[in-house]
């Protein structure tokens, strides 16, 4: 188990997420089919932050400030191809939070998904928590957490400071979840559910 405080891989993700939030970045992630259609009809090269971190389009190095490029490199999430760069992380808005997850297309075996089902799941959690709130000091365990929006949504809807544990067998998911807990300004634990 690891604390959800930023580590060498998550720290640059947290910095990037905070910078995006301060820049006013917002992106609601559509279905993969919608994503493919939009990218097929619009210019393929990114022109702004939403194109880079939402639509997962390749971009010229000059489109991002040096610190953002450094954070992507430090996290191992920057691709160089054909004279353009591509982010291997995408950031999506859910309520007032930003969540880091895998860039489109999510075809790798360790891809961390986020999309319309995530929004429905978070909405269900918020409605259930409003109908039957947890007591202060509650423990929240999100198994198969992915990027962590379920557990984080439950913790944000809980009065007081619940103990949050996010578990997943995918190490990439735990990196994103750890960064997302920190981005939400929360304390929590991330665990590989096989070894913990």
For every predicted segment, state its role.
Residues 22, 42, 51, 79, ...:
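Acidic-enriched, low-complexity/disordered segments with a strong bias for Aspartate over Glutamate
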Residues 51-55, 104-109, 158-164:
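Short, Lys/Arg-enriched charge-dense amphipathic segments
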Residues 85-130:
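Class I SAM-dependent transferase core
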């Amino acid at each position: 188990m690891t604390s959800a405080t930023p580590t060498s891989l998550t720290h640059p993700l947290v910095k990037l997420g905070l910078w995006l939030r301060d820049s006013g970045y917002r992106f609601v992630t559509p279905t993969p089919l919608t994503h493919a259609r939009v990218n097929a009809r619009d210019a393929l090269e990114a022109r702004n932050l939403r194109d880079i971190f939402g639509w997962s389009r390749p971009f010229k190095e000059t489109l991002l400030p040096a610190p953002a490029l450094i954070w992507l490199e430090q996290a191992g999430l920057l691709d160089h191809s054909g004279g353009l760069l591509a982010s291997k992380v995408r950031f999506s808005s859910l309520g007032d939070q930003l969540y880091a997850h895998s860039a489109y297309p999510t075809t790798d075996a360790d891809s961390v998904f986020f999309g319309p089902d995530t929004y429905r799941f978070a909405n269900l959690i918020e409605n259930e928590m409003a109908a039957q709130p947890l007591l202060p000091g509650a423990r929240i365990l999100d198994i198969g957490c992915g990027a962590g929006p379920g557990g984080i949504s439950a913790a944000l809807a809980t009065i007081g400071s619940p103990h949050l544990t996010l578990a997943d067998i995918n190490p990439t998911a735990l990196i994103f979840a750890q960064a997302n807990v920190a981005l939400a300004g929360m304390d929590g634990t991330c665990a590989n559910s096989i070894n913990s």
